[in-house]
Amino acid sequence: NYLLNKKIKNKFVFKFLNQKEYLTFPIDWNNPNFTQLWRFNLHYFDWARDFLDYRINNLAWSKDSRLLKILIDDWIENNQLGKGDGWHSYTISLRIRNWILIIRSCPEFDNQKYIDSIWLQICWLYSHKEDYLGGNHWLENLISLLIGSLQFEGEKAERIFQYSFKELEKELKVQILKDGGHQERSASYHLLILERLIELGLIIENITGSRPAWLIEAIIKMTNWAISIRLKNGNYPLFNDSPQISSPIDEVVIYSRSYLNRFKLQKKGIKSKLTEMYSKYGTTKDYSQSQNKLTSLFDTGWSIVRYDNGFELLFKFGDTCPKHLPAHAHSDLLSIDIFKNGKPIILETGTSNYGLNTTREYERSSAAHNVFQLALLPISKKQKINWIEPIETWGNFRAARKAKIIKKINGIRPNGIVWLQGSHDAYERFGARY
């Protein structure tokens, strides 16, 4: 889906975010005609994992993946140190891991030029950390610094490892809530982070033989949270920025169990490669069945009610984001989604892009969610209706005033009826409360 299988007059087709673009060698990695997020996806080299999985599962490269070495060479030659999207700390974090996995898994990629480039990127990332930002970006930085520093010997590599090890342990205690959810309250980013942590745990164990207790604790909590929010259709709630960009919940849970219970995976590409150190294959049991009629995630601020007749009701009645990090927040306080046998009956719009555009503005607003809306009538016909947003989202990753949650309670009555209640203070300055 990323690198399409046609070579058209020396043009190579990449497709990210439902947007197809034609590239030629040498590639313009920072082409201003592409959106920044599209360029970021190009720089991640996440798309190379599809090639790597094929190579591991079939002991041969696919036709398209023969371009991989050319693309890595092209990146090194045409991305000057510190210039362009390729040297953004987030893109470096993802690319470091992907290149390391390629080199570690495929001897034909093990050459000094690639190793030198990886070390240079690690050192740059160590000097340009996103610790000021926090959230998933900071976790991605730390995970990559840990994996990267483990590949090298020497005083600096050891210093990077020790620093990142301590910081990640500390940061997980901050970012992982008591109920196991990630503080940014996005199911898709939760699953992405969980996959990264599992991969980190496997790599640490492969190289050092150790299994950090704090890492296992975080993985267990996050896995249990993922199981608890799984819907009948196998998907997850769309609250906040939760596009379907991560692996399915069941796949992530099985990956987690393979690490926690030390069993090998079959035909899973790089995931099976990382679990080869274990002596036996494990079960592919569906871990999503142990769900309650009422799932209450008070720290995350979500409740899910599951009825015997196939209905599922999702209710968001808690804070939408950390105060300092509204990048993935939506104005969806007290939002309700309803499913019947896995099919949406009442559903929010979701997230289609991260661009600075009217679609992004709409998808973050109350109008794109199933919530009560309050507006002030315009003074004249020329003025627009002034909708009051509980979360005043703006730009593509910003938010101003944020309503405070006043009440969030729920329960089950003796007759089995489930009740949910929540309120916020967004309208109190107008003499109203919802």
Name the predicted role of every residue range:
Residues 9-11, 26, 37, 44, ...:
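A common structural microfeature
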Residues 35-220:
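Aromatic-lined, polymer-binding surfaces characteristic
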Residues 1-28:
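Extreme N-terminal leader/anchor segments
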Residues 181-346, 409-413:
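Carbohydrate-active enzyme catalytic cores, enriched for enzymes
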Residues 25-30, 93-102, 140-148, 182-196, ...:
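Carbohydrate-binding/catalytic loop surfaces
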Residues 7-8, 63-64, 386-387, 418:
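A short coil-to-beta-strand element that immediately follows conserved catalytic motifs
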Residues 289-434:
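Non-catalytic C-terminal accessory modules of carbohydrate-active enzymes
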Residues 22-36, 82:
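Short, charged low-complexity linear motifs
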